[in-house]
């Protein structure tokens, strides 16, 4: 395997479902998030966590793989790199969460630890727990890009 291959697959991950968001987000303007605050409107804010119910949830994963690495990306959770496996050693070189258990750390509430998230314009961005779009393409040389 000399090039990067791309596969879309389903992963079942035990998940604590996200509670309903605040219906009046303008009242969450004074919520302090890691020494930052702001106006979330028109976005809704999750102000609580669910610890009573855990379900097996199916996630779409974009898997990029070559002979050395296997990278799993979860577009449904902000496009976060869920796992990165060094195939030569069998070592996951980012922390891989085995349970999705949101905490109230994100700008709009829900955030999970593990993997790698895209952080812009600052840490734990507003869309870090929101679904994102993705496109995969195979280049003329057979290399996959996402």
Q: What residues fall within each predicted segment?
A:
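Intrinsically disordered, low-structural-confidence terminal and linker regions
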Residues: 1-20
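A short, sequence-level motif marking secondary-structure junctions
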Residues: 10-15, 74-81, 98-102
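Extended, loop-rich substrate-binding clefts of extracytoplasmic carbohydrate-active enzymes
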Residues: 26-65, 113-146
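N-terminal localization/anchoring segments of enzymes in phospholipid and broader phosphate metabolism
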Residues: 62, 81-84
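Active-site beta-strand termini and strand-to-loop segments that position acidic
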Residues: 64-67, 86
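Primarily extracytoplasmic ectodomains and periplasmic/lumenal surface modules that are beta-strand-rich
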Residues: 69-72, 78-82, 89-92
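Beta-hairpin (beta-strand-turn-beta-strand) motif
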Residues: 76-78, 87, 98-100, 123, ...
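Active-site-surrounding "flap" and adjacent substrate/cofactor-binding loops of secreted or lumenal enzymes
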Residues: 88-107
